C-alpha cells in the first residue's frame, strides 16, 4: 500500500502549472459519443484515474479511444452500444454523464447506478426527470437505470437544485432532440460553460451556459472537433491554500481568477495577498491569518470541492471560524482525521466550529474522499513532525503528481510503498 509522508515546516515558493480540470474533462469525453462524424481531439487532459475510467467506459460502448500525454482522441462513428456496466460505473459516479449522450445518439441507455466518493446520497432523480420531460421512459431495476426513447423532443425542465451532473446530462441529451429545450435553475460552473463551448464547436446550438437558464435548439447531427480543457480551478485553489498556510510566495500558473473569485475573496479577507498576473495568480501568505466563516454554495458561491482544504487554513487562523456545508450531506468525514492531528473542531449539524490557531501534530491519517486527501496533506505541510496519509486511491482520482508538485515548491513530501520503509526512521526519507 502506498502512502504520502509529509514533514511539516517548509515554506513553499516558486511556480506550479495547473492541469486540465477533472470536472470539465469527464463530461466532455462523454460528449464525444454524440459525434457521428469524425474524430474528437481533446487537449490539456489531466492524467487521472477518473479519466482512465471514463475512457474504459467509452471503449466498452464501442468507441475508439486513445490517451497519449495530455491528449485524448475519440472516434465514435461506429455502432455505439448503450449499456454501461457496474464494473466501470462503480468506480466513479461521473460515469452517469454518458447517459444523456447515449439516449440522444442511440435512443436507449442502460447505466449502472453510480459509485465514486461516498459523499452523501447525491441522487440522480434530477437527471431522470429531465430525460422523462423530453419523452424518455425511465425505470430503475436491479441496480441499473434504463431509459428509452423513440425520439427525444424539446421540453421545459426546471431543476429543483442546480445540479452540475443533471445540467450536463440534460444539456447533452437535448442537443439532438427535436425542437427547443429550456433548462431553468441550472448549474453555472465554469465546467458547464466549457462543455457548452465544446458542444457548440461540434455544431450544437446551446445558449446561456453560465447563466441560470440554458436554451438548446436541437440539431440532426454533431461532428467531432478539437477542444482544449479549461484549467482546474480546484487544483488551483488547493495550491493557493498550500502557499497561504506555509507563508509562501507561489505563482499558480494558468489559474483563472474568474473561476475562483469566491475563494480569492475569502483568502483576502483572511489577510492573504492575492496578485493577478498575466499567466496566473500569485499567492503570498501572511504572518497571521484572520478567522472567517465560510458557507459552501452552488457556483458562483464557495465551491464544496474546496471545503476540506479551506478548513485547514481556518484551523490555523486566530479565533473561531465556522464552515457550513449546504451542497452535500455527510461531507465532514475528514474532521475526525484532522482531530487526530490536534485540530480543535466540533460538528454541529451542517456546520463545523473551528477554534484556532491550532498547533498541528503529525499523525497517521486516512483520506476519506478525494478533496479530504489533499486537505490532510496540506495539514501535514504545517504540522509538527511527520504526517502519513493513506488511501491514496482517492487522491489519484483528482490530482496528478500532487506530491511531486509540492516537492518542486520546496515541501518535504514523499510518496512511498508502505512495505519498503522504516516507519521508526521517517527522517531518512528526507
From Swiss-Prot:
Pathway it works in: Cell wall biogenesis; peptidoglycan biosynthesis
Residues that, per the record, bind UDP-N-acetyl-alpha-D-glucosamine: 93, 122-126, 305, 327
Modification type 2-(S-cysteinyl)pyruvic acid O-phosphothioketal: residues: 117
Cystine bridges: none
GO cellular component: cytoplasm
Family, as annotated: Belongs to the EPSP synthase family. MurA subfamily.
The protein, known as: UDP-N-acetylglucosamine 1-carboxyvinyltransferase 1
UniProt lineage: Bacteria, Bacillati, Bacillota, Bacilli, Bacillales
Amino acid at each position: 500500500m502506498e502512502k504520502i509522508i509529509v514533514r511539516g515546516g517548509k515554506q513553499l515558493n516558486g511556480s506550479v502549472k495547473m492541469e486540465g480540470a477533472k470536472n470539465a474533462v469527464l463530461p466532455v469525453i462523454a460528449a464525444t459519443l454524440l459525434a457521428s462524424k469524425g474524430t474528437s481531439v481533446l487537449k490539456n487532459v489531466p492524467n487521472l484515474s477518473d479519466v482512465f475510467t471514463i475512457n474504459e467506459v467509452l471503449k466498452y460502448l464501442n468507441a475508439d479511444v486513445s490517451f497519449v500525454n495530455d491528449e485524448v482522441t475519440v472516434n465514435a462513428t461506429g455502432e455505439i452500444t448503450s449499456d454501461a456496466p457496474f464494473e466501470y460505473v462503480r468506480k466513479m459516479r461521473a460515469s452517469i454523464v454518458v447517459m444523456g449522450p447515449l439516449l440522444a445518439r442511440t435512443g436507449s441507455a442502460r447505466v449502472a447506478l453510480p459509485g465514486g466518493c461516498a459523499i452523501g446520497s447525491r441522487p440522480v432523480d434530477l437527471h431522470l426527470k429531465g430525460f422523462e420531460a423530453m419523452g424518455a421512459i425511465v425505470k430503475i431495476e436491479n441496480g441499473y437505470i434504463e431509459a428509452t426513447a423513440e425520439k427525444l423532443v424539446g421540453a421545459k425542465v426546471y431543476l429543483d437544485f442546480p445540479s452540475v451532473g443533471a445540467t450536463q446530462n440534460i444539456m447533452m441529451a437535448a442537443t439532438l432532440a427535436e425542437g427547443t429545450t429550456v433548462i431553468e435553475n441550472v448549474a453555472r460552473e465554469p465546467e458547464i460553460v466549457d462543455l457548452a463551448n465544446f458542444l457548440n464547436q461540434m455544431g450544437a446550438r446551446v445558449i446561456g451556459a453560465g447563466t441560470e437558464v440554458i436554451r438548446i435548439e436541437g440539431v440532426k447531427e454533431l461532428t467531432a472537433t478539437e477542444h482544449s480543457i479549461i484549467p482546474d480551478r480546484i487544483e488551483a485553489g488547493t495550491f493557493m491554500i498550500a502557499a497561504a498556510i506555509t507563508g509562501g510566495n507561489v505563482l499558480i500558473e494558468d489559474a483563472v481568477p474568474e473561476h475562483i473569485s469566491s475563494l480569492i475573496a475569502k483568502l483576502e479577507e483572511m489577510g492573504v495577498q492575492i496578485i493577478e498576473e498575466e499567466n496566473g495568480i500569485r499567492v503570498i501568505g501572511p504572518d497571521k491569518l484572520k478567522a472567517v466563516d465560510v458557507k459552501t454554495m452552488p457556483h458562483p458561491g464557495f465551491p464544496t470541492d474546496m471545503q476540506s482544504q479551506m478548513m485547514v487554513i481556518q484551523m490555523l487562523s486566530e479565533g473561531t471560524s465556522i464552515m457550513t456545508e449546504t451542497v452535500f450531506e455527510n461531507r465532514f468525514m475528514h474532521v475526525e482525521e484532522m482531530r487526530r492531528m490536534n485540530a480543535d473542531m466540533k460538528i454541529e449539524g451542517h456546520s463545523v466550529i473551528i477554534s484556532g490557531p491550532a498547533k498541528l501534530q503529525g499523525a497517521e491519517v486516512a483520506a476519506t474522499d478525494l478533496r479530504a486527501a489533499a486537505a490532510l496533506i496540506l495539514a501535514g505541510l504545517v504540522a509538527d513532525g511527520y504526517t502519513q496519509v493513506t488511501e491514496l486511491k482517492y487522491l489519484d482520482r483528482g490530482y496528478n503528481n500532487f506530491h511531486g508538485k509540492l516537492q518542486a515548491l520546496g515541501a518535504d513530501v514523499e510518496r512511498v510503498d508502505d512495505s519498503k520503509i522504516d516507519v521508526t526512521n521517517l527522517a531518512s526519507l528526507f
